[in-house]
Swiss-Prot record:
Source organism, top-level taxon: Bacteria
Organism: Serratia proteamaculans (strain 568)
Key words of the record: ATP synthesis, Cell inner membrane, Cell membrane, CF(0), Hydrogen ion transport, Ion transport, Membrane, Transmembrane, Transmembrane helix, Transport
Gene responsible for this protein: atpB
Record-stated family: Belongs to the ATPase A chain family.
Gene Ontology BP terms: proton motive force-driven plasma membrane ATP synthesis
Protein's recorded name: ATP synthase subunit a
Amino acid sequence: MSASGENGTAKDYISHHLNNLQLDLRTFQLVEPHSGTPTFWTLNIDSLFFSVVLGALFLFIFKKVANTATSGVPGKLQTAVELIMGFVDSSVRDMYHGKSKVIAPLALTVFVWVFLMNMMDLLPIDLLPFIGEHVFGLPALRVVPTADVSITLSMALGVFILILFYSIKMKGVGGFVKELTMQPFNHPLFIPINLILEGVSLLSKPVSLGLRLFGNMYAGELIFILIAGLLPWWSQWLLNVPWAIFHILIITLQAFIFMVLTIVYLSMASEEH
């Protein structure tokens, strides 16, 4: 029997798995699923919890490897960490042409953190929600932080702030304003048009960065939920296994794309005109 058969219709099952565990910051009480449209004061605490835990896991692993690193024959974990660091460092050297000690650590953090959050999509779809409901009494639980648009746009907002910081740092306030108002048409009469064009171009970077990651991971999560909700349990593996194998490529690719675009945007912001 499928999970949908145990918990109601397939529609109910799918809808349940697309609900976040939410906290109303005005009352500090959990929001019941399907109780209405989320507001500005609604916090998706499951997405926040898993993103923080996975970020802490990343820091713990890399800190442990750094403290126990040896110049002799490295272990498997040290080898994996060194390969990741070498790959990220090579990517930064190829794409970032400025001078900054922040970009490489930032790129490493972005790549590994996004990858770990994406990897949560490979867990059995009912495992953690079942534990959350029957052990902790949680009304809902989603375990893939990057399938939550608030998480991906928050990360993109951080990148956007760095874009503004490096743009102003390299060009000064006057140079930054001039870039927004005197390009692409270098004439005072075209300042309003230039401001609209450059403003849209600037704002589209974080929006596209966040929505691209969200869209791909949400779609991947939804496919797993549809397979679990519409098929009997004994036949789910026929689609789950091939999709999971293919999804590993998507998970890695999306983490790489997020890292690359972050580096490219910061490199563009660091260019002097």
